[in-house]
Amino acid sequence: MASFLEKVLRTGDKRVLKRLRTYADAVNSLEDSFKELSDAELRAETDAFRERIADGESLDRLLPEAFAAVREAASRTLGQRHFDVQIMGGAALHLGYIAEMKTGEGKTLVATAPAYLNALAGKGVHVVTVNDYLAEYQANLMGRVYRFLGLETGVILGGQEPAVRREQYAADITYGTNNEFGFDYLRDNMAWTEDELVQRGHNFAIVDEVDSILIDEARTPLIISGPASGEANRWYREFATVVQKLSPETDYEVDEKKRTVGVLEPGIEKVEDWLGIDNLYESRNTPLIGFLNNAIKAKELFRNNKDYIVAGGEVKIVDEHTGRVLAGRRYNEGVHQAIEAKEGVEIKPENQTMATITLQNYFRLYDKLSGMTGTAQTEAAEFMNTYEIGVVAIPPHRGIAREDKRDVVYKNEATKYAAVVRDIEERHEKGQPVLVGTASVEKSEYLSRLLAKRGVRHEVLNAKNHAREAAIVAQAGRKGAVTVATNMAGRGTDIMLGGNAEFNAVDRMAELGLDPERDAEEYEARWPEVLKACEEATRSEHEEVLEAGGLYVLGTERHESRRIDNQLRGRSGRQGDPGESRFYLSLSDDLMRLFNPGAAQRLMAIAPDDVPVTGRLITSGIANAQNQVEGRNAEQRKNVLKYDDVLNRQREVIYKDRKRILMGDDIEDQIRQFTEEVLSSTIAERTGKGHPEDWDLDGLWEALRAVYPVSLTPDEVVEEAGGRPRLTSDFLQEQILSDATVMYLEREEELGSEAMRNLERRVLLSVIGQRWPEHLYEMDYLKEGIGLRAMAQRDPLVEYQREGHAMFQDMMAAIREQTVVTLFNLEVRKQRTGAAGGAVELSAPQRPAFLQYTAPDEDGTPHAEVEAVDPGARERTSEDGTPTDASAGTDPAASSDRPEGETGGNRAKRRGASARSGSKAKRGKRR
């Protein structure tokens, strides 16, 4: 199906390209007339465009003129003129396509035209990048074009105060990372006042490196969590000790490919003996299974100095693909705590989910979505199925002159790396720059040691120098440069032969103390001379590198995805420059060992140690292994989306209701409806069966008093009905609802109408804030065990949808009940405000001091980061990653004095999903 869809999508490319070419021709026809405009006249075009949009003119019709204005502005401010293919790429973005443009085609400049055009409507444009550095760099550089045309540019960075973020979002065009945009959306839906909101809608997004963000990172949802109750540390340490006594294969199984573990019968018996329990799988022992599985994972699947390092008494994750220490990030679902127990360091607490969304569903919020990347065609079908956006391949400005050489495969790693070092030495000696891609930090450091022994000067991008990443990558095209990096490191930074003059110019301006925002006039005045000096310095070296053969990209291992391999190759041969690429592999590489072990083992048996192996078997083996991984990952993303779609429908209901309350809507009628439903349900439960003489009116009144202060007595109601036999459920409801209305009006008269409306909003927000995280917990717990339904011949997804809907209805009923109970029973203190009388004192909900943010890294692996949210503790703590206990915002009812005997908190029965105490543990599977 996917391959058929890909063919259909490719067929449509020609029609789209024809349309884009028409737009480019129209822009070209306007170029001379825009060149004749003065700076002031060119800037005035922006106001003219806005007036035409206000009069009803469409953006499509305005495109040629707006693009021509941006082209001329970029030429005057940056010294860069949009090529025709860049205009075509920009038009594709405006039309809501993903533009596939090869490395070096100037994608950053491409985004300026559609961003400007769409910003004219006044609804904001978001430009999404892969990291904070690129967001800030692009906002500063391209912001010069926008400011020249009279638009404001903002940038969202980690650690910014809400007031600063709100200001940045108010700009016409805002740069930032997918995680920052997504977390701001979630935080807005956790806000307690309108003043706390920072985003202003989701109009149009341009996603840079769109495949990385919407594909690679889409397996992991964004999660905001706060510490859960319970003491699990003892069990983490206990099981860290227990698993040391268990043996792989005998007591448990490990699947490295799927990164899963399973406990075998002998292992279960040993654990039961150690813990002194009869049956590990009894319901009361179920949480222990999660601790056991995580302890085995920590022992077998996570290695020190590869997946993480231990520094300063903390376990710090190392991103295997970028080589960076992910400061403050943590594995979720108890895995990080299990590793901490294994390493004998302090165990930080687990957390409870407070808000979550997948990247797929976040980006579906935008009215229009587009993106750019050098490698999208392989995922065209998934982009269409998931996001309903097509991929169009934009032709390069100049043909690609890079020579992609055939893979060289050795029997083992030692001979492979010996050949790699020889090849690097030869290239280095003739002055050809070399970019070496490795699969992990461990491998990059190993290769670095080999190069050092041979006296080859080189730079290494790893956990120890990630702060210099962009600078190192930008200069990786200089004569004789050797740069060793993990495959994904430095993505988004252009490698220019002879050095990156523009990058050097930005650095030079910073050295001169000039800021593009603060010193806009002086910055613009000095830029041309600084850029010219940097260009002259790199021009002669550029020619020398061209003669040496251009950039040589050497891959030391194939990535799981063909797309990542293509990205690595694509670093060479930009803008028609010469270049080469080659992969050196070994039969013991992870990809071959895990995903095509049969082919690898057969070749290992016959291959000589120091002679490279070639042939169709190798090529097909690699392709087969990559297809397996890509298929598995695509299935995971599809599965994540299916289940999140269920939760997304619920989230939309909650967030829409919450936003309405937050914006100050009058919810008096909604509260009245809540009261009717809660009381009617309470009455129906106790009068639905039997004759009136059999009804337990005393029990009913006890239940009613737990909801509101009833002023009627059972005898008064019976007398009003004309006797017990004539009593009906409808009559009871009429009397009780009338009484409740009177009592509520009395309360409103006591507090004042305005204060009552405010109290209604605050209480309902608070109850939603308490119940929604509880529901997320229950849904997560349901999802963990739902796969077992397949054993009973039932579709797990259908079961999840059915039970999830029932749980959502329970939660909504619980919200209604708790809101009504709190409004009737909450004791509200008054303050004297002079002769005018009393004012109601409403305490703000308690705020957590810290929250944990879980998000995918560049390859989609989930990691968590802890950040202070308390105004007095705003400083971001990700550098040391120390999480601090925090609780969710509390219900005003929970933090205020209530009349004794009139609270709903001591009711015997709670409607809806109840929150479990203690840390959540995965359900185990006996094998």
Curated annotation (Swiss-Prot):
One of its GO terms (molecular function) is protein-exporting ATPase activity. One of its GO terms (biological process) is intracellular protein transmembrane transport. ATP binds at Q86, G104, E105, G106, K107, T108, D494. Coiled coil: none annotated. GO terms for cellular component: cell envelope Sec protein transport complex; cytosol; plasma membrane. Gene3D superfamilies: Helical scaffold and wing domains of SecA (1.10.3060.10), P-loop containing nucleotide triphosphate hydrolases (3.40.50.300), SecA, preprotein cross-linking domain (3.90.1440.10). It is a peripheral membrane protein. It is found in: Cell membrane; Cytoplasm. It comes from the Bacteria. Residues 907-927 have a biased composition (Basic residues). It catalyses: ATP + H2O + cellular proteinSide 1 = ADP + phosphate + cellular proteinSide 2. Residues 860-879 have a biased composition (Basic and acidic residues). Its EC number is 7.4.2.8. CDD domains: DEXDc_SecA, SF2_C_secA. Part of the Sec protein translocase complex. Interacts with the SecYEG preprotein conducting channel. Has a central role in coupling the hydrolysis of ATP to the transfer of proteins into and across the cell membrane, serving as an ATP-driven molecular motor driving the stepwise translocation of polypeptide chains across the membrane. NCBIfam families: PRK12904.1 (NF009538), secA (TIGR00963). Belongs to the SecA family. Monomer and homodimer. Part of the essential Sec protein translocation apparatus which comprises SecA, SecYEG and auxiliary proteins SecDF. Other proteins may also be involved. This is Protein translocase subunit SecA. It comes from Kocuria rhizophila (strain ATCC 9341 / DSM 348 / NBRC 103217 / DC2201).
